[in-house]
Amino acid sequence: MEREIYTSDRNPDSADTSWLSKLGPGLITGAADDDPSGIATYSQAGAQFGFNLLWTVLLTYPLMVAIQLVSARIGRVSGHGLATNLRRHYPPSLLYGVVILLLVANTINIAADLRAMGAAVNLLIGGPARAYTVALCAISLTLQIFVPYRRYVRVLKWLTLVLFAYVGVVFAVRIPWSTVALRTILPQFSPSADYITTLVAVFGTTISPYLFFWQASQEVEELNATEQQPLVKKPAQSAATLGRIRVDTVVGMGFSNVIAFFIILTTAVTLHAHHVTDIQTAAQAASALKPIAGNLAFFLFGVGIIGTGMLALPVLAGSAAYSMAGTFGWKNSLALDAQLAKRFYGIIALATIVGLALDFTSLDPIKALFWSAVINGVTSVPIMVLMMLMATNPNVVGTFVAPLTLRILGWLSTAVMAAAVFAMFLFL
């Protein structure tokens, strides 16, 4: 982020701070991963294949933690977001290509999430879904532009609680826990195009480029908000700060994967068990639950769609704005007044409004989401490669090179995503 960095000997990441206070960028990033588009993907996985894709949560968790840790470390150690570091250390053509693909994918995701949120309100209380979509868009945009950063982050933290709705759904249905445990540890693979495509979609939903940009930039926001310096300039703070990042990321990604597990589990034990196997939207999943699992499950699922959408929209729009601002060296911070960072907030508004506009076109939301997943997958691999290179580049991180275990897991995560992209194109 291009803004003044203040100095202080006080370290808010020190051991005497509360455990909950250590949760911030990682928690919000992990929760935002379970957006309405992700909910639709996990719902389809459970509805179509029952318990047989629960194992993916066990695989993606350590990989997701590793790559998000790399992202967070780059931001906190260097004092700059991913796009700024790419601009400073890599060819412009590579940066421009990555950012354009990110903008396209994020805008389509915003459109899909807004539509799902409007449909969820319609399911719960009736009325015009499109009017709800517009209203929710306006509320989200107003919060992003006019609410001060520290208060805004507290709002996002509270919104993560809505994800427990998907845990609550489990208590409304009967779960064969022994079978669940068996299928999670010993899954039954199906070498079919549908199985591979859904598997790729789950990987692509779980490990997404916008999460990389958001968490790195949020670490810089936290650095500035607490009047700290980057670790390359203040190495004495590294133990406490990197420890806080570890806790935050491990908990945040764990939260994300637990919720994903419960969404797959809920739809498997309800929809799949009743031969409802074609779920294409989150709202459709909520609607299908009602006659099978009852009003409570339906209500919790619907509320979850709205809450996760409100959490994910600022992450999608914000990561697009951070990437553009970092690319061109603009002022960028949610802590800055909109008048002081007009272009940064302009991108947030533009991405959100264009996403809303797409909902009033003939664009097929399911096809749009599919191609968004393709773009996300294609974009994530080169970004992950560049992140792993930055994490070991002394020009970026100084002496804070990623440790061996993190490098191994980071490259493994990159290899899994590359294989997923290859499989995606193989079955297109």
Where are these regions (language model features)?
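Membrane-interface "cap" regions at the ends of multi-pass membrane proteins
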Residues: M1-S37, S93, E222, Q229, ...
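Flexible loop linkers connecting adjacent transmembrane helices
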Residues: E2-S8, T41-Q44, L69-L94, A119-V121, ...
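Juxtamembrane transmembrane-helix boundary signature
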Residues: T29, T56-H89, G97-A111
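Extracellular/periplasmic helix-exit of transmembrane alpha-helices
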Residues: V65-V77, S217-A225, G254-Q284
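Hydrophobic transmembrane alpha-helices that form the core helical bundles
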Residues: R73, V77, L95-G126, T133, ...
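Loop-to-transmembrane helix boundary motifs in multi-pass membrane proteins
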Residues: P92-S93, R130-V134, L296, L300, ...
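Transmembrane alpha-helical segments of multi-pass small-molecule transport proteins
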Residues: V99-I100, L124-F146, V162-F171, L340-V354, ...
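Hydrophobic alpha-helical segments and their helix-loop junctions in multi-pass secondary transporters
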Residues: L161-Q188, S192, T205-E221, L386-N395, ...
